[in-house]
């Protein structure tokens, strides 16, 4: 899990099972990602992003609009790298059914990460995908099934603080 309080990014080291602060580059990139909450397309122009309709494309048997979203560059290994994501919106009801982005670091660098979304359900007037998969394109992916969504719960800010002990 990755935790971010707005200033400090940290997670649990899988080997030691101890909390570890992230390096500055990771923290800076998480700050950029916070610009996208609750959605990358919300106010995209004022964030300096650009969106381009690539055209219609069939994705997993569904006709979609393929949109290229170019966001503020991320820093990877000390260099600014383009942050480009492709979204596939169902042409019938305009919900995203897939997201593809190039992996820019680590052992999977150069491969395409793919997230698929389905089983949209309404929660307090908003639609959310209750079924998702995430993985490398054209390889087995990890499923995520959501049982329920609670909007705007009260969460103690201390949950996000790095444990000092």
Which stretches of residues belong to each language-model region?
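Flexible, processing/modification-adjacent segments and terminal tails
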Residues: 3-79, 106-109, 160-165
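Gly/Pro-enriched, hydrophobic low-complexity segments
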Residues: 60-162
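Broad, structure-driven detector of short, well-ordered beta-strand segments within folded domains
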Residues: 1-4, 85-87
